[in-house]
Amino acid sequence: MSDEDSMLLNFTTNEDTAGSSYKQAAKVTGGRWKDRRRMKMKLEGKTVSRKRKANTTGDEGIIPGRGENSIKKLHKESSYSSEEQEKYKGRNAHNTQGRTLPADSQFVSSLFTSNREITTAVNTNIHDENVAINPSNAPLKGDQFASLGVTSLLVSHLEQKMRIKKPTSIQKQAIPQIIGNAGKNDFFIHAQTGSGKTLSYLLPIISTILNMDTHVDRTSGAFALVIAPTRELASQIYHVCSTLVSCCHYLVPCLLIGGERKKSEKARLRKGCNFIIGTPGRVLDHLQNTKVIKEQLSQSLRYIVLDEGDKLMELGFDETISEIIKIVHDIPINSEKFPKLPHKLVHMLCSATLTDGVNRLRNVALKDYKLISNGTKKDSDIVTVAPDQLLQRITIVPPKLRLVTLAATLNNITKDFIASGQQSKTLRTIVFVSCSDSVEFHYDAFSGSDGHHKNLTGDSVRLLTKGNTMFPCFSDSRDPDVVIYKLHGSLSQQMRTSTLQHFARDNEATKGKHLIMFCTDVASRGLDLPHVGSVIELDPPFAVEDHLHRVGRTARAGEKGESLLFLLPGEEEKYMDYIQPYHPMGWELLKFDKEILMPAFKDVNVNRNDKFIRKDEKSSKNKDVGDKEYEWDTNATTWHLNIERRVVGDSAFKNLAVKGFISHVRAYATHISQEKKFFNVKFLHLGHLAKSFGLRERPKAMGLQSSKDGNSEKKPTKENSKNKMFRMARMAEKQIASEFNY
């Protein structure tokens, strides 16, 4: 065939012919139309147009068609420096006047604006200062312990060593009846907090033992089993009992509480003891697993005491108590060895309040009991009231101002203590909050602000040192003489014990100082802390019984005391009518601004904790910043902004603030049903409440459960079909672009 007969074919090929077949093969299906189109364009090598950023300050960031006003607005948004923004937001945050701050900046609200109106204008339960007050829980003047049947050895020991000369009203009623009972009846002891219920059952038990002619030592067995709801109360009863029996060294008490080594407790039980004092869980554990404790109880046990019965039931120990009583009743009692002791077990139940739980426990533990009470009778019921010598105060504070009002209250107490010149005495103040995370936040907020402090006992006790600026009354020329404590159930038992001992001890370390303890209700029951001048309830109690126990930490044994209750505007104001029957002597209703904040922040200057200087201070270079005095509301705002700036700059402190706020809201939702009409989480303004924890906005992780280390844990989400399709498409595109794809 010649060349002329041949046929020539011309083919036009693109440069990416090889790759196009693969790209066409990767067909995108499923999902939305926009997603399919975007993925198809990406596979074809086309670029996807992106939206321009609206906050770009250059000319290329301006959206066409908006005109000159858009350019001016963009330049105006970016013209504020960070210092001017914070100054502007602090002055008038609720009115932006049309100006828009950058998206990454935080909104700082004003303390004194947009607060809920306080409707209570008149105090309906006024405290009359002209009425003569007789302390309701004070020792009686005309009575002696000897006339009640207490042995002379104990009477002299009480007067010389413990400095107790007169019995209280409940002790006068209880001691003779328990001594002369001979095992016929059980007893229900009901009295006010701070009236001496512990001695009302310990003194007759020890007196009965000392009146026996039989020789007694630690090997004679346990005569009494005392059960308390908390470790702190059990430890206090143990120390009181140890002090009482120090006059007769052959009587030995034993403490059984959680957090201690069981091996050491078993060793003490093997050596022998005459009084077993402990918490329900640990006592039941030893009754079930320690053989020697049953041997101790079978020889001499005659008394079972349940102290703070309402708290035992509130903490859910009803089944534990029933098991303990059942085991003890199954132990045979040998009454021939000590014939002068009661021939059967005597049960005693002690409580400062009468609740449904106490009534259930009374039906389980007591039989043929006698009621011993010094409460007032009303409509055939016994009503427990606060001590007559207690000065109760109530203040209604908006949620945003809770923290700065608390600081002003503590400042006023400290300032009055310094002005009194009583350097030889020790002043104690207890601040009750709702949860342990809130304790941690307030403890660090008031003790770790500027580094001028030192730890005294681990990390739970801090002494404020010279140069500290937490309270406006502090001066650079002298030591603050303020010690901050924290106490809650999440601390280790050793730290809880050492903290309480340091707070209650009168020595050179606490002499002339103001001791402030932030705590939960773990310190509200039964603890006899000496010379507590004031009790502050920053968070209202979960039940009115807890309120009586809280205020009972002060005004004990006839001494004067003060208590301050914080309430929020709105529904919580009606709580005053609810607690009015428990305060027959009335209360003082304080205005938070004029009577608390103004005395604390007036005639002082609170400096900022950053390097920013006001414009009026820049004009005078030689003038000291601290020489100029500002209005009290400006000082209060500056103080609170210092806390907020610390939250922003310190991640660890911010974590404490977030955890404290979230735990506080969760705890607020646990009020009993009868009080939900006053304390309902739906009534809270969460944004305003977050500001009282130094937060400039409500945390977004409110519903997430937090792990123990504070990090929120999220479960991995399952991949849906659309995301899986995109992932497979990306893998196909990557495979096509690979150099190994032939």
From Swiss-Prot:
Q: Where in the cell is it found?
A: Nucleus, Nucleolus
Decide whether keyword Cell membrane is in the record: no
Q: In which residues does the motif DEAD box occur?
A: 307-310
For the protein in the UniProt heading, the enzyme class is: hydrolase
Q: Do the record's keywords include Cytoplasm?
A: no
According to the record, the residues making up region (Disordered) are 45-100, 701-726
Output the Gene Ontology terms for molecular function: ATP binding; ATP hydrolysis activity; RNA binding; RNA helicase activity
Q: Name one GO biological process term.
A: rRNA processing
Question: This protein's superkingdom?
Answer: Eukaryota
Cellular component (GO) terms are: nucleolus
Query: Which residue ranges does the record assign to the Helicase C-terminal domain?
Result: 405-605
What are its E.C. numbers?
3.6.4.13
Residues bound to ATP are: 191-198
- The residue ranges flagged as biased composition, category Basic and acidic residues, are 710-722
Under SMART domains, the record lists:
DEXDc, DUF4217, HELICc
Q: Motif Q motif: residue span?
A: 143-172
User: What's its catalytic activity?
Assistant: ATP + H2O = ADP + phosphate + H(+)
UniProt remark on domains = The Q motif is unique to and characteristic of the DEAD box family of RNA helicases and controls ATP binding and hydrolysis.
The family classification in the record reads: Belongs to the DEAD box helicase family. DDX31/DBP7 subfamily.
Describe the task this protein carries out: ATP-binding RNA helicase involved in the biogenesis of 60S ribosomal subunits and is required for the normal formation of 25S and 5.8S rRNAs.
Q: What is this protein called?
A: ATP-dependent RNA helicase DBP7
* Biological source species: Saccharomyces cerevisiae (strain YJM789) (Baker's yeast)
